[in-house]
Amino acid sequence: MLYAVFFYVRYGVSYRDLEEIMAERGVDVDHATLNRWVVKYAPQIAANAQAKKKPTASSWRMDETYIRVRGKWTYLYRAVDRDGQTLEFMLAENRDTASARRFFKRAIGTNGVPERIVIDKSGANLAGLQSINVILKFTGVGRIIGIVQSKYLNNIVEQDHRFIKRITRPMLGFKAFHSAAATLAEIETAHMIRKGQLGQQGIPAFKQFVALAG
């Protein structure tokens, strides 16, 4: 079943198409069962990937992209470093200061405090990051994050969005927020493996993915 999950989040097919692909290989799996497996393993796989990923640079690029859930747009917040290595991701129902602040706290929690973050011209992202700097200042962390607003410098993360969107497009949207978040976590993890972020060159991507499931 983990092979089906990996195939789904790595290559971008619909649940129905994956049923047919697996049936051709003699494996009987329905889309409801596959969805349960995606949701079941997502937290563990994503957490283990974060724990095992190689060190990243202290200059970040942050942006968000749109994901359709229940026929409505939600927002996938994403950050990569200057080399395009994935740092963190978070699906949110709203694109506002609170969501941006929550994302920055989460990214810092898993990657430490960066020297600077490049964002777009979004006022919500700016306000969210400024509020993080206030917290850093008054907690005595010793480093205030440099803020750069530049669409041009954010090309790295915008280009990185394309891989995620290429995988999600054939999925034709998600029916529930929690399953969307779980699926995206595994898509991001498969993307990290593809970029070699787990430092296991020579090991097949599927084996790396299965190892993260425990």
Regions found by a protein language model. Give the residues of each.
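Residue-level recognition of single "structural anchor" positions
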Residues: 1-214
